[in-house]
Amino acid sequence: MNKSLTTSVARRMASAITAAGATPHRVHFPTVGLTAHLRNGEYLTRLGNRWRIPMATMVAPAEYLRAVGGDAMVAAAGPGYVLMGETSAELRGAQVGDSIVLRDIRFRMRTFTVGAIVPNAFVDWGDIFMTTESAQVLGPMSISRVVATNITSYSRIISKLKSRGIIIGSTYRMRTSWDSENPDGTLGISTLKKKFGEFAFRPAGGSAIQIDAKWKLTNILWRHSFADIRLRNNCHKVAVKAIQGALSEIKARGLQRHVDVANANRYGGCYVGRYNRMAGSFGAPSRHAYGAALDINTTQNYQWSVPKMNCDVVRIFRKWGFAWGGNFWPADGMHFEYVGERRDNIGYPSKYCPNKVPVPTTTLPTFAPGATLTTTTTSSSSSTTTTTTVAPITSTM
């Protein structure tokens, strides 16, 4: 299932942003397969037999990049060039001037040059950025977001969207760079790879993917038995200690009846080699493919339904370093995703199971002429740039 913006809806969003005096940009987030990495004509990585490394790719117009990164960054992302995030570059030892071979929608080879290595924010905490113009050779891709820059009035954008039938909060969401930290926010792909390891994969029919056997042998603990609450699942070794800590605390607090062990052991668990159910033509591996997420109580908490997970259980998992899917768009109440940092001490107006700590006051920034507002799922505040994102309901399972 792919939830993206139709061309018609994206056009209405752009019209609203323009009417509000700002500049709209269509943004795409395909996951593109990398099959080779070269330096001075020598292969550093070369994959065959349809194996590929998933590269989380941000695609946006050059004028968007100019608004948030300046002229020098646009020059580095010229035709046939990509910007690579610093974490992704670290993972593969990439340098400026290296060549990477990406595969288009028909799995044909397309070669790009690394024009610059940039802070992760400029690749949306993924792997690479390329301009819309450069990405045309990859083939058609779904519209993920409409981003606004050069904003003078946030409220005016909301008003103009509403007048065109774009209601924020039901089918669509708005994200801004001044948003408070979300306790259920997930890791960017490059951070996920650094924590859990990067793998190669190839399609295995339908939503299934085959993942590199060496990566699985190194990282997945097969049929691991947890104590206190007797789950037995295939999970990533990095997440196992935190899962055990959460389960032990749930048991110690007398909440074990809220974990359906039989259901979790048969229908839930961590590792599944598959695409994200929300992936499009350029499919992204699920967080479960990394063994980084745990599903429990699946019958009562199926995707899109109002979550029925016990809130004390939710907060315990947050304490042990998990984001909860009950506040994803759409809700995925069975899903706990390891992020590696405590999340129960973050005040945020969560729709379901908010933490029991004060919610900080959010101050709307002052918009000067030329300020930038973009819409993104994971955005960070900057002293020079203000950003906001309009996007359809999506998930990162």
Spans of features found by a protein language model:
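Short amphipathic alpha-helices in soluble, non-transmembrane regions
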Residues: 10-17, 157-165, 308-318
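Membrane-proximal extracellular/periplasmic loop immediately following the first transmembrane helix
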Residues: 1-38
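Catalytic cores and adjacent binding grooves of peptidoglycan-active enzymes
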Residues: 279-374, 394-397
